[in-house]
């Protein structure tokens, strides 16, 4: 069977998005293109420090773009010489990530939103019945504040199937319902975007990415992608 073209993939994404906005920050050329090229390049990938730093840089730039969508209110700041009126963000931001690949990406967001609270989860799917028909979430570790009425940013570098993002979302929201959710990824696959659309609140979620690649392979890796982000950041695992 012929694989869908990249054009058809993007057309499909635009068709399914409806209320949920999908923003690819690489649609306009910027220094993000350079960071993405280095992340993908198998020769650059040998340098873990450079790889982590580029993931962090993309997180910083994506955080800046997200900051343009926040609510702002007028505040007065006193300088040594007088007073200055300025517009400051009024959102109460929670930066969340899923261990382990998300840590450098999370750091980039925290560098920008340095007053934000952080949330972390380590979770995986498990069957809750003997027939293996009902899937639940086993949370090994969860640290999160009350999310009620707050702006939640879930940063995970690879949005492949969307399963990990859903697990993280369900774990975090046991601590309350956020005002808005920003799903942030370095690279997204159409399958992952569709899964988020099916499992997240459509009118309260925005998907951000630095690239939308064409497909998943049989091992559920994004193609062309970059490989295993966690291994490239921290080394291979057993």
Mark where each language-model region is.
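PRPP-associated nucleotide enzymes
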Residues: 5-238
